Amino acid sequence: MTQVTHSWNAQLYNDKHAFVYDYGKSLIELLAPKSNERILDLGCGSGELTFDISGLVKMVMGLDKSPEMIAKAKYNFPSVNFEVADAANFKVEEKFDAIFSNAALHWVVQYEEAIASMYQALCTGGRIVVEFGGKNNIRTISDALRESLYKRGYEKQARINLWYFPSIGEYTSKLEEAGFEVVFAQWYDRPTELVDNHTGIVDWITMFGSSFFDGVTNEDIIEISKEVQDKVKPELFKDGKWYADYKRIRVVARKK
């Protein structure tokens, strides 16, 4: 499959997809940050969780590959340090006690490079506390989207490799190979309610699947998005509300 870089609409993210960081609040509890710690928020998005962490620790830094997201984060939370950086190849001058990452690492298809980057950024005994899409995450939506693209002759777009959704076994093995000790790992089913009861799936595709539409006509984009929503309705529309079929991984691991 072809690898691509996704572009982000920070305003749409905040307006209709705030569930991304709302669900991440419980991950901060798993992080259990201490007042004397230096924390790195990897894939911080528009910075809401980074800001929450900032009041609990000595120092926090937010990194994200998207300049649009970092600009939004800096505007909303000027007291917090945010920088543009790629999770697959970032470097730090001073080691961190922990790396926190919510709903970001499935966007990094160079996952081995990301694991190596996290390892070098931690002090000995430091930990990662991460959550992201696991095996079969949004399978219903992505299968329907690829099928609609193929049907209209957009075979190249349908083959795009946009995400990394590993099993628990695959990801924890990669962490151990890199030198981490895995102390907690969980895969779970988390159907996620979408904001708009009329255009929930269309909005989700606009936010998270727009990279599939490079080279697709505007007319076809509209038709495909609506078609996908119609296809998945029997499975993902319940009691008058739209849900995305999220499957999540949570992992805590320490640098030995």
Predicted regions and their residues:
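A short SAM/SAH-binding and catalytic strip from SAM-dependent methyltransferases
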Residues: 98-112
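Short alpha-helix
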Residues: 163-178
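Conserved class I S-adenosyl-L-methionine
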Residues: 1-37, 48-52, 72, 76, 127-154
